[in-house]
């Protein structure tokens, strides 16, 4: 039977998804299932790793069944995943020793504070991992599990525990424990991987007291990792041939193959990446240096700005405040008024990312008067997403010396035309939205397809990607500058709140 499709395994922060693509990049079928968000304490976020695997394997089977595609028609699987979220499990039983600790979780802030007391080590971490010391990354989360779960430290020292980001956890389960591996992009998000030597960093592992025996093998983003176990997907042994963290996969899906090309993904968080070529560029502006992907042992590097809360602020005004019935309603209410009337919402629910890196910042609404209505709050929430993206992209301009020559966008929130137009206005730049909104999944299948010869080369990939809509700035630069100054003042009000008032 001909291999006409590639299956994207897209494991996100709030849902597990499976997407079947054909050779022209068309979507045959999407299946999706949300899973439980666990909040044991203020600032703590967890997932049940077994529920992640259960929902992910379920939607894979559902996509095949309802897409009327047989497993042996799948040429390869590409995996893309929420990054930094980490699982520690028993090597023999495959059972997690604790819930997955999610990238948003701030429980290891005190561990990070301890590291920051050693400026030389902080410098070492930045120069060798490309990251700042923050609870966002996997390394301190693993240390917390080993230090706080009964018996975990002893088992780890005895070589009985494994760890991995979500891609590694899925590969382990898809292959029934035959493959314990990750790719360069996911490894570069752990704060444990040396992006210069391309090895796990022994100095950092020793500092955090994490045994190297727990760590997965690191492979190219476009490479056959192994095949699915015959019991996993209807008896077929399908090559797992592409793996990348969600933001890296999106950069690849946008065909940002040349130095200086950039994209912004609007999901739970908001993430901008710029391709900086085959050598790392280190930021003076609070950006992260990361590995975008690797092919044939050669990494492509990127600068990244990370915003922790983007689309999640719309979930909050829907579920937490009850201001809208659906996320789509936010656009309707935002366009009922001409402006926020001076209201700003800073969604620092779990701290602030680039360029502030303030673990203790908390959510703030400023500028409220007796005239403030729910429309103003809703519009301010949407505008906050765009302002945070501008914070990041301004940093990229400073670090690279390049003006933003348009921005490629993707993610659920790009369906909100108000947000995209406001983003174009506030950046004073063109915004391009592709026809395929599932760009993260597309990036994963592009990587997998190249590895198995499904597509010939990157030039062929470029011919598949087409633009649906372009947004041009409609607001003058003086008005933009005035509004942006207000945002910066609002951010100042949110900083260090938990530190001062906890």
UniProtKB/Swiss-Prot annotation:
GO biological process: glycerol catabolic process; glycerol metabolic process; glycerol-3-phosphate metabolic process
Residue numbers binding ATP: 13-15, 268, 311, 315, 412
Protein name (record): Glycerol kinase
Residues engaged in binding ADP: 13, 17, 268, 311, 412, 416
EC number(s) from the headed UniProt entry: 2.7.1.30
Name of the encoding gene: glpK
Top EC group: transferase
Annotated source species: Francisella tularensis subsp. tularensis (strain SCHU S4 / Schu 4)
Function: Key enzyme in the regulation of glycerol uptake and metabolism. Catalyzes the phosphorylation of glycerol to yield sn-glycerol 3-phosphate.
Ligand binding (sn-glycerol 3-phosphate): 13, 83-84, 136, 246
Record pathway: Polyol metabolism; glycerol degradation via glycerol kinase pathway; sn-glycerol 3-phosphate from glycerol: step 1/1
GO cellular component terms, A-Z: cytosol
């Amino acid at each position: 039977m001909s291999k006409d499709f590639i299956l994207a395994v897209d494991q996100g922060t709030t849902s597990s998804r499976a997407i079947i693509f054909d050779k022209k990049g068309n979507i045959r079928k999407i299946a999706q299932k949300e899973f439980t968000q666990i909040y044991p304490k203020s600032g703590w976020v967890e997932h049940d790793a077994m529920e992640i695997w259960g929902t992910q394997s379920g939607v894979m089977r559902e996509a095949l069944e309802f897409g009327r595609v047989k497993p042996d028609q799948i040429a390869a699987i590409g995996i893309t995943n929420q990054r930094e979220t980490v699982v520690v499990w028993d090597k023999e039983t495959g059972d997690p020793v604790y819930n997955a600790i999610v990238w948003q979780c701030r429980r290891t802030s005190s561990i990070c504070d301890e590291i920051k007391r050693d400026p030389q080590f902080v410098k070492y971490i930045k120069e060798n991992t490309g990251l700042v010391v923050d609870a966002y990354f996997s390394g301190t989360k693993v240390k917390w599990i080993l230090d706080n779960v009964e018996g975990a430290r002893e088992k780890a020292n005895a070589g009985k525990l494994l760890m991995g980001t979500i891609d590694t956890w899925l590969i382990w389960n898809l292959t029934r424990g035959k493959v314990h591996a990750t790719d360069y992009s996911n490894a570069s998000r752990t704060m444990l991987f040396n992006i210069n030597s391309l090895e796990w960093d022994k100095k950092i592992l020793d500092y955090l007291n994490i045994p190297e025996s727990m760590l997965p093998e690191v492979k190219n983003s476009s490479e056959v990792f192994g095949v699915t176990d015959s019991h996993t997907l209807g008896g077929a042994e399908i090559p797992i041939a592409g793996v990348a963290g969600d933001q890296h996969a999106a950069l690849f899906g946008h065909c940002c193959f040349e130095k200086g090309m950039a994209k912004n993904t609007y999901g739970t968080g908001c993430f901008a990446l710029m391709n900086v070529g085959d050598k790392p560029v280190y930021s003076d502006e609070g950006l992260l240096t990361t590995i975008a992907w690797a092919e044939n042992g050669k990494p492509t590097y990127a600068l990244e700005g990370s915003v922790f809360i983007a689309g999640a602020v719309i979930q909050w005004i829907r579920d937490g405040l009850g201001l809208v019935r659906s996320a789509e309603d936010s656009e309707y209410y935002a366009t009922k008024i001409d402006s926020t009337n001076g209201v700003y919402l800073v969604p620092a629910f779990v701290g602030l990312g680039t360029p502030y890196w303030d673990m203790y910042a908390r959510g703030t609404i400023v500028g409220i008067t007796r005239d403030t209505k729910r429309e103003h709050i809703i519009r301010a929430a949407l505008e906050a997403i765009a302002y945070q993206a501008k914070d990041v992209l301004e940093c990229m301009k400073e670090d690279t010396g390049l003006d933003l020559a348009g921005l490629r966008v993707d993610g659920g929130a790009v369906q909100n035309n108000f947000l995209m137009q406001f983003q174009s206005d506030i950046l004073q730049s063109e915004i391009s939205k592709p026809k395929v909104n599932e760009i993260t999944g597309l990036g994963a299948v592009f990587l997998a397809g190249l590895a198995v010869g499904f597509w010939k080369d990157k030039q062929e990939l470029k011919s598949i990607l087409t633009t649906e809509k372009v947004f041009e700035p409609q607001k003058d630069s003086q008005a933009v500058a005035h509004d942006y100054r207000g945002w910066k003042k609002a951010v100042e009000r949110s900083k260090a709140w938990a530190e001062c008032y906890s």
